[in-house]
Amino acid sequence: MSMEYFSGISDAMRITFVQVMILSVIAIGIFLYGMYLNIKKWGLGTTGYAQEPGGGGILVFPKVFASRIAKKGDWKLILKTLVLDILLQRRIIKISKLRWVMHITIFVGWMTLFALSLLMFLVELLSLSGVNIHPEALRQALGPWNDLFSYLLLFGIIIAIFRRLFVKRARDSTIAYDAVLIAGLTFIVVTGFIAQGIRTGDFWGLGINWGIDAAPQMALFHAVISLLFCIAYIPFSKYIHIIATPLTILANVEAEEGE
């Protein structure tokens, strides 16, 4: 399959690429609006012990957070917390090793795939703007890494499903939000593999004759649901904890480190 299938560099596929660009802008716009609402809501909290709640302005929370971080003074401790508690998630491994494997594989798989997709998207834009760059060469180089981290993400999702079905404590604590997140991630990953299988003819194509136009259509469908679920939906779901939890840990690093 030639590069036109992905990039829209040919006239036949240009609409598809433009659609993805428009959807990306819409998804990012929804995400930013959701984050605005969350940050404003967080600003309703107090700025200190025994103080009155803040006015909820958009700048209240960032100012308080920056002030608390600056007061710590120990940047080595902050860096240590950033690496161990946020990136490597050592707090979770102390609670459950299986839960940690689930979290770290989903986190690393998802974030790496997002970074690779963003890189490829930027290269496509540069190519369209006339820069002498070859998206096809980069795509082929990134192919094995995309496969690796896709399977890593799938592995984490399988663990999540296993825990929700067979681990009593996890099953009893499961709420609708959890089920939606797991189902959404599963659907996105599976459609991504199927889109790849249709394009390359591997076993993820399920041996079905999808037709000549199925590959770009399936890729576009996968892109749409990925943008809406993995970007636009974040501020309005439990996904917000991937942003809120690191901020909370950093803001309380000194107190929690001393426990």
Q: Predicted segments — roles?
A:
Residues 2-259:
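Membrane-embedded alpha-helical bundles of multi-pass integral membrane proteins
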